[in-house]
């Protein structure tokens, strides 16, 4: 019965001696610093060299993730994607309108070349004939103008020779009989007979006018 307390005291001493080395191993007073890398330390806590492999890998992963989220379609609609779709739809609509306008212009061009050009050639030939008639008419008008100018010269000359008395007054003077005593001999030379100028004939320039019935 006396060995019980002694055995208990011995066991407590052994457990205390075993606990001291374990506590020294975990305490900071032992002089040994743990070289193990904490799992909580981040990638920016690495004090290795700059050209160490895998140093920029987290940055590259984050950049790739950002580009992927911007380019790849996501579950919900994104504002920039919707704006890009709207601009593409508007551009396609304008391209369709431009293509339709080109088709219309091409059709109009073929219509003009196929039908308009022959009609223009025919009208050009007709206009050349009309221009020839206009030239002939201008020459005819110039000839009439010269004839009228000659007639005006002869009328002015006749008025100067015969006087400007009215025709009725001259007839009245010619009807009055004057005695032979009061008649005087002609003082000047006798006037030559009147010769009318040569005028144009309308039939020479317009052949069909002579065949028309006179009204």
Swiss-Prot record:
GO cellular component: axon cytoplasm; BLOC-1 complex; cytoplasm
Highest taxon, organism lineage: Eukaryota
Subcellular localization: Cytoplasm
Low complexity: bias regions: 27-42
Keywords: Albinism, Coiled coil, Cytoplasm, Phosphoprotein
Tissues in which the UniProt entry reports expression: Widely expressed.
Chain coiled-coil ranges: 80-97, 134-165
Modified residues (Phosphothreonine): 164
Primary localisation category: cytoplasm
Single Gene Ontology BP annotation: melanosome organization
Region (Disordered): 1-57
PANTHER family the UniProt entry points to: BIOGENESIS OF LYSOSOME-RELATED ORGANELLES COMPLEX 1 SUBUNIT 4, CAPPUCCINO
Function: Component of the BLOC-1 complex, a complex that is required for normal biogenesis of lysosome-related organelles (LRO), such as platelet dense granules and melanosomes. In concert with the AP-3 complex, the BLOC-1 complex is required to target membrane protein cargos into vesicles assembled at cell bodies for delivery into neurites and nerve terminals. The BLOC-1 complex, in association with SNARE proteins, is also proposed to be involved in neurite extension. Plays a role in intracellular vesicle trafficking.
Homology family: Belongs to the BLOC1S4 family.
Disease: Defects in Cno are the cause of the cappuccino (Cno) mutant, which is characterized by a severe oculocutaneous albinism due to abnormal melanosome formation, and prolonged bleeding due to deficiency of platelet dense body contents.
SUBUNIT field: Octamer composed of one copy each BLOC1S1, BLOC1S2, BLOC1S3, BLOC1S4, BLOC1S5, BLOC1S6, DTNBP1/BLOC1S7 and SNAPIN/BLOC1S8. Component of the biogenesis of lysosome-related organelles complex 1 (BLOC-1) composed of BLOC1S1, BLOC1S2, BLOC1S3, BLOC1S4, BLOC1S5, BLOC1S6, DTNBP1/BLOC1S7 and SNAPIN/BLOC1S8. The BLOC-1 complex associates with the AP-3 protein complex and membrane protein cargos. Interacts with BLOC1S5 and BLOC1S6.
Protein name per Swiss-Prot or TrEMBL: Biogenesis of lysosome-related organelles complex 1 subunit 4
Organism the protein comes from: Mus musculus (Mouse)
Gene encoding the protein: Bloc1s4
